[in-house]
Amino acid sequence: MALLSVAVLNVLVVNAGSTSLKLALVDEDGMALTVASLEQAPAGVDAVGHRVVHGGDRFRDPVLIDENVLAELEAVSKLAPLHNPPSLKAIEAARHAFPDRPHVAVFDTAFHATLPEEAATYPLPARWRQELGLRRYGFQGISVQWAAERVPVPRLVVCHLGGGSSVTAVRNGQSVDTTMGFTPLEGLPMATRSGSVDPGLLLYLLRHGHASLDELEHALQYESGLLGLSELSPHVHELEAAEAVGDERARLALAIYARRIAQAVAASAVSLDGLDAIVFTAGAGERSPQLRARVCAHLGFLGVELDPVANEATIGDGEIAASSSSVRVAVIVSREDLVIARAVRQTLAAATTD
């Protein structure tokens, strides 16, 4: 496969999640066309960009995919067993569909390569950290990067609240702290993931035979979070509807979720030595005024105050802080597809000039 000698106009973006596959054709003007399947991709694809969740220590920048890169991605998959294997399958299928087009991997972990040692280092034995590469990598960086570009303030906190949830502290456009760690399981409670829990609790379950290793992993990944708390649904909008008719389990799940998000925002303010703006993005962050209000209700001591009318009216990009708020609060629609398409063009342009 030869690199294109002409400008890359149309990039097919392949975003493979743990349970979904999203395809979009992005043109040079940033217009995106949703594509139903690889087989139905329109003519004119110049290059293909792939979102890959975990790049490990090896990949800190987008990379042109070849057989050597694929082998290294296979090795990294053990660090993200729910996310990287679907990406690899999607890469294989896309390379088969477009064998004469360049394919570029863009990593969710790359934005967090700027984490300082005090944010990235676990308080574990040095032999484990050094021999096994145990450190905090951070995830959802492509989405966070887009939000940070839209709200370019010195001290920003980005709340990515989708099926996976994280809070990231961004100083002058660079990640300095984030809630996800070695894997995307750490941090906030999520749709079905537990987020951070007492490690001693997990040892207790294993030691006393209450769960096998596989059962424990399945429970932490698929049976916990909002679903485990409510026993109803992993979806914020469904829990809000249940709460509205008096379901106490739904109320508790949403209250815990909002409280943990707010705690992470406050911790991020410590990492940033202050706070200029908060961004809500992804799924519930973009579409749940109730969740945003719940989170910000905990943050008045930081000078955060919402405009209730603007908050209720905003489904998509918008400013929702009250005029009296000392902290800017914005909603930004996540556009990972545009970030990936741009990274593909930059990577291929650099490769053709080397």
Feature annotation, model-predicted:
Residues 10-43, 181:
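Short glycine-rich, Thr/Ser-proximal phosphate-binding strand/loop in the N-terminal lobe
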Residues 10-14, 47-49, 104, 156-160:
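Short glycine-aspartate micro-motif
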Residues 16-17, 51-55, 161-163, 275-287:
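Glycine-rich beta-strand-to-loop/alpha-helix junction loops that act as flexible
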Residues 44-87, 96, 101-104, 110-122:
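Short beta-strand-loop/turn "lid" adjacent to the catalytic site in phosphate-handling enzymes
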Residues 111-208:
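Glycine-rich phosphate-binding loop of actin/hexokinase-like ATP-binding domains
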Residues 171, 177-209, 218, 282-313, ...:
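Catalytic phosphate/nucleotide-handling subdomain of diverse soluble enzymes
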Residues 208-253:
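A mobile "lid/hinge" subdomain adjacent to the ATP/sugar-phosphate binding pocket shared
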Residues 251, 255-279, 285-354:
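Internal helix-turn-beta structural module
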